[in-house]
Amino acid sequence: MSLFSRLSTWYFSKKSLPYWGIILLDCCLILFSALLVYTLNNGVLSTLDILGHLLVTLLVCLIPYLVGFRLFHTYSGIIRYSSFVDLQKVGFAVLFGLICVVVFQTLTDFSPYLVYIRKRDLILSALLAMSLMWMMRVFVKFFYVSTFRVAKAERAFIYGVKQGGVSLAKSIQNQDPARFVLAGFISDIAEIEYRYLMGVKVYPNDEELVSVMRKKRSNVLLVSPLKVEAIRNNQEMVDRLIKANIKIYMTPAAQEWDGRSDLSHTQLREVNIEDLLPRDKIEIDLEAVRKQLTGKRILITGAAGSIGSEIVRQVAQFAPERMVLIDQAETPLHDVRLMMARGWPDIESYTVVSDICVRERMEELFEEHRPDYVFHAAAYKHVPMMEDNPEESVRNNVDGTRVIADLAVKYGTRKFVMVSTDKAVNPTNVMGCSKRICEIYVQSLDQAIKDGKVRGRTQFVTTRFGNVLGSNGSVIPLFKEQIKRGGPVTVTHKDIIRFFMLIPEACKLVLEAGTMGNGGEIFVFDMGKPVRIVDLAERMIRLSGVKGIEIRFTGLRDGEKLYEEVLNEDETSKPTFHPKIKIAQVRAYDYADANLRIDALVQACAVEGDMQIVKRMKEIVPEFKSQHSKYEVLDE
């Protein structure tokens, strides 16, 4: 290693030079500049003859420059991070020193012991000194950036050239140590393609994107906040990047970024598959929801589950008076309790460990708290589990819903919002059928109240949607775990497709539907574009960077469909004022008949076997046709 390399390594290993070190360097540059200018104008021999007196003169002249350094704090910055502001401070300090020296010389004509220096030489030496001080700072910064700060940094392109992209670029340029080095921008705007921005070229977003990134030795794409939605909905671009093993990092989406504050590189995170699935931005009428929920008493069942806990979070933001949170899973409910204490300590909240099927306990809660709104998210949801345990599906899903619905009517709840599923449409499994029976019960009860057959004021609203990303036991966490173990990734069928929605987005629509509903509606959500599960698995494998992972087809599970629906063939829908929510026009049921049939079904669970229970369910829901299940014999 050369002496220069050793010195530079030693210097940059320090946090910064001490104040006195920076001042000493600047003073040396001023003295050098003055000596050089004087020598060039008066000759070497003449300078050597008076060198002693000249040095004394220059040291005296240095005093006002030192005062200027103190006034403008030129020494307080870290040289390797010098900016235009630091150069400006140096300029002001040198100008101050020059003016003081010229004024001093004019007023005193220098003492007999000092050498007279012409004003022209004073000005030239000051300009040279200022230039050298600037050059020293720029050189140190450039050398540090090009050699030390970016030694282990990855070359990255930024997708997006507007405010978000520029803010992100500034942030990564100020990282220390550098995580990324800016290699270029990607733009969808034709007018600025191949121009330069912040010293790098802007490239078009076309089929040559991967090739361009390879030429620039980059395998990282940073997505600006304003382009998050664009990349999600450009699946062709995403596929090209994933196949080329380009790492994609995202910042907060535009709705999470205020558009004014600078983005921080710490906000960048490598994408998950959930980030890249196509979906539309969902906005709801927050003011309408706020008017309904603020200052009200809210009861939420299944409050510790994936959907329930997100409903808790979203409802809490509207400052209700009281929240009663029910779940039979103690540990996750404790987590919800801690979340409420930490995030919303001013809301009166009660976490209740209980089974919703225990009518006596539920009645105690309704009598004590008398909720204005009930969000009913409690349910068993795993299809294979419910195929094996139909009596529990009936007990928890059907009878539990009936208990909560009846008590809501008895204690004057204004609105009851039930979370249903697309598996309730043309059900092929026990779980889906149990949820369809729940829909039938709350709809018929709502109509009975409207017809005056049941006394009460409660409005019953049902929300029906499909798979949510990241929920407990869903396919994405399963695939992640299988990839982590090295495979194989198991898919039930090569043609199976599903709709996906983020949990927060689904819960937003639940709140919106709950506030817009007048009772008796089944709201169905627009779930966006369907996703082939095998394509999802392939993407996740590529995104992980792990090679050689097999995808194994295991066959459809008991009761599993190839595709899900939100309406059956006899149902139609009509639009609402929200583009993502429609109202299903479904067959009406008589409340007394539905209640009688459900009574018989619940009682049968205590004395009859699985086949008899499922047979009764099929009598209530004639469109329930079992698939890949032992119950198919009942359809013959």
Give, region by region, the residue ranges found by the protein language model.
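NAD(P)-cofactor binding segment of oxidoreductase domains
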Residues: 232-249, 322-329, 368, 388-415
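A solvent-exposed beta-alpha-beta segment
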Residues: 40, 44-46, 140-258, 331-335, ...
